[in-house]
C-alpha cells in the first residue's frame, strides 16, 4: 500500500504541493489529474524518490520513501530509452545494474516484451520503433524488475488518438494481469475517467486534493466490455463532463 500523509513540497523555490493525503491500495489504479502547474509531475517525482520533500511522509508497504528504489517502476513521458542498446537490452538494463545473471535477465526481458506485444522485436533498435512501440518498451522495462508500484508520467500524451487508445487498453490489461498498484499522471480528462479506479483532482498550484472520485469504467473494461462501448455510455460522458467542469474551474481560478 502507498500512503501519503500531509505532504508539502516546493519546486523552484515556490510551493508546489500542499497537505496531500492519499492512499493507494494493492490492485488499484489511481489517476492524478489537474491543470498545468498543479504539481502532478512533482508528486510522481516525490513518490519515485527523485526529489526530496519538505514536510510529511510517503510510505510504500510501511517503509518511508527517501530515494529511488527497485520496488517502484517508472515510465516517463519521453520513454528515457537508450538508443545505443537494442530493445531487449533496454528492457534488461535495470536488471543488469542489479547484478542479475545475463541469461536470466534476457529471459525476463523476453517475457516482458511478450506481455506488451513486442515479441520478436528484441534485436531492433529504438530508432526503428514507432512512438507507441517505444512506450511499450518503457513499460516492459519498468515491469522487468517486478516492482510493487508502477508510476507513469503522462506516458501517452504525445500519441495519436488511435495509438493512445491502444496503449490505454494495454495498460489496463497489464494492470489486471499483474495485480500491481498503478499511479498514472495525465492531463487527458477522457483518459483519466476511463482508466481510474480512483481519480484524484488537484487544484491549481500549489496543488491540493480537490476531490476524489471512485470510478468503475476500468473494471468494466477488464471484465470484457469494449472501450468504445464504455466511452459512449451516457454515464461515462456525464462523468467526463463533470470532471471537465471541475478542471476548468481551477484553470479560471489560476488565471
From Swiss-Prot:
It is found in: Cell inner membrane. Gene3D superfamilies: P-loop containing nucleotide triphosphate hydrolases. Residues 2-229 form the ABC transporter domain. InterPro entries: AAA+_ATPase, ABC_transporter-like_ATP-bd, ABC_transporter_ATP-bind, P-loop_NTPase. Keywords: ATP-binding, Cell inner membrane, Cell membrane, Membrane, Nucleotide-binding, Translocase, Transport. ATP binds at residues 34-41. It holds the Pfam family ABC_tran. It catalyses: taurine(out) + ATP + H2O = taurine(in) + ADP + phosphate + H(+). GO terms for molecular function: ABC-type taurine transporter transporter activity; ATP binding; ATP hydrolysis activity. Its EC number is 7.6.2.7. GO terms for cellular component: plasma membrane. Coiled coil: none annotated. Belongs to the ABC transporter superfamily. Taurine importer (TC 3.A.1.17.1) family. The complex is composed of two ATP-binding proteins (TauB), two transmembrane proteins (TauC) and a solute-binding protein (TauA). This is Taurine import ATP-binding protein TauB. It comes from Shigella flexneri serotype 5b (strain 8401). The gene is tauB.
